[in-house]
């Protein structure tokens, strides 16, 4: 399974924590005042409790990001606008069946600065989101 797109979520967000760790506390700070609880409960069934009584939402997909922490230094932005520059787009895959072979590097920030590009879209980039690409390969089930 591959999940990819504009998540409007930075790598350190609750959304990414939930997707990559397969669970998140129902009391996570990013959920306060928002109506995620009802949606996640409908989508997920029920919460699980841990030994401290804290409740968690969980999913059974074992996902991994193609652009892992060690590559995030290379990928500075997937969204480059006048007032926000950061990573909002992601490619995730099931870690049991797929492996990341390679990823495309990010934009040349020095080139953007040198050419006085303060945001996208512009004549060089038609969207505020910049492309990301990953090459994946199937993991042979006999070698797992």
Describe the role of every protein-language-model region.
Residues 1-2, 7-144:
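Metal-dependent phosphoester-hydrolase catalytic domains
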């Amino acid at each position: 399974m591959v999940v990819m797109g504009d998540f409007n979520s930075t790598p350190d967000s609750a959304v990414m924590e939930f997707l990559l760790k397969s669970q998140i506390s129902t009391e996570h700070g990013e959920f306060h005042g928002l109506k995620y609880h009802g949606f996640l409960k409908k989508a997920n069934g029920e919460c699980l409790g841990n030994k401290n009584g804290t409740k968690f939402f969980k999913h059974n997909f074992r996902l991994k990001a193609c652009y892992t922490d060690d590559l995030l230094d290379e990928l500075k932005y997937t969204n480059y606008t006048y007032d926000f520059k950061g990573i909002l787009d992601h490619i995730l895959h099931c870690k049991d069946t797929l492996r990341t072979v390679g990823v495309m590097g990010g934009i040349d920030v020095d080139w953007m600065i040198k050419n006085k590009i303060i945001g996208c879209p512009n004549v060089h980039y038609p969207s505020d989101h910049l492309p990301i690409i990953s090459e994946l390969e199937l993991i042979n089930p006999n070698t797992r």
